[in-house]
UniProtKB/Swiss-Prot annotation:
The gene is MYL12B. Residues 1-20 are annotated as: Disordered. SUPFAM superfamilies: EF-hand. Phosphorylation increases the actin-activated myosin ATPase activity and thereby regulates the contractile activity. It is required to generate the driving force in the migration of the cells but not necessary for localization of myosin-2 at the leading edge. Phosphorylation is reduced following epigallocatechin-3-O-gallate treatment. It comes from Homo sapiens. GO terms for molecular function: calcium ion binding; myosin heavy chain binding. This is Myosin regulatory light chain 12B. It comes from the Eukaryota. The keyword Disulfide bond does not apply. InterPro entries: EF-hand-dom_pair (IPR011992), EF_Hand_1_Ca_BS (IPR018247), EF_hand_DJBP (IPR015070), EF_hand_dom (IPR002048), Myosin_RLC (IPR050403). Keywords: Calcium, Metal-binding, Motor protein, Muscle protein, Myosin, Phosphoprotein, Repeat. GO terms for biological process: regulation of cell shape. Pfam families: EF-hand_11 (PF08976), EF-hand_7 (PF13499).
Length: 172
């Protein structure tokens, strides 16, 4: 009988552990950033992100998403998207990205002088003509917040850090 109690306790604790692992994946400042993003998307402030919230958020960014596009986004979640689900989905997406050194090494292949930078025009040419080709608009979007100095050098080491860990505040 005591073994049944132990099994029951273990079974009850598993979902809790899975949930707390989501929060353990990120540091406190990252969780706060995700919370702010969640609140910006949750337009009606009901604690859940629904299709209308997504539509309103994308519309505020100048996009005009189709119902099919919104449905596809909503179907990525196994259920209602509360903050914990939102964090879980981001955790899964971030874990699905390549390790930092793999991303950095991919850029380094085009950095013949090992400076940690690539000329932005050269990178644009590579991105729009090789492999899974980017459109000019996609490259513009990438460059919008990218670490590019006044001479047009794209700092791929810093970009990789931002990609994996988030942007530093401008005040830091």
């Amino acid at each position: 009988m005591s073994s049944k109690k132990a099994k029951t306790k273990t079974t009850k604790k598993r979902p809790q552990r899975a949930t707390s692992n989501v929060f353990a994946m990120f540091d406190q400042s990252q969780i706060q950033e995700f919370k702010e993003a969640f609140n910006m998307i949750d337009q009606n402030r009901d604690g859940f992100i629904d299709k209308e919230d997504l539509h309103d958020m994308l519309a505020s960014l100048g996009k005009n998403p189709t119902d099919a596009y919104l449905d596809a986004m909503m179907n990525e979640a196994p259920g209602p998207i509360n903050f914990t689900m939102f964090l879980t989905m981001f955790g899964e997406k971030l874990n699905g990205t390549d390790p930092e050194d793999v991303i950095r090494n991919a850029f380094a292949c085009f950095d013949e002088e090992a400076t940690g930078t690539i000329q932005e025009d050269y990178l644009r040419e590579l991105l729009t003509t090789m492999g899974d080709r980017f459109t000019d608009e996609e490259v513009d979007e990438l460059y919008r917040e990218a670490p590019i100095d006044k001479k047009g050098n794209f700092n791929y080491i810093e970009f990789t850090r931002i990609l994996k860990h988030g942007a530093k505040d401008k005040d830091d």
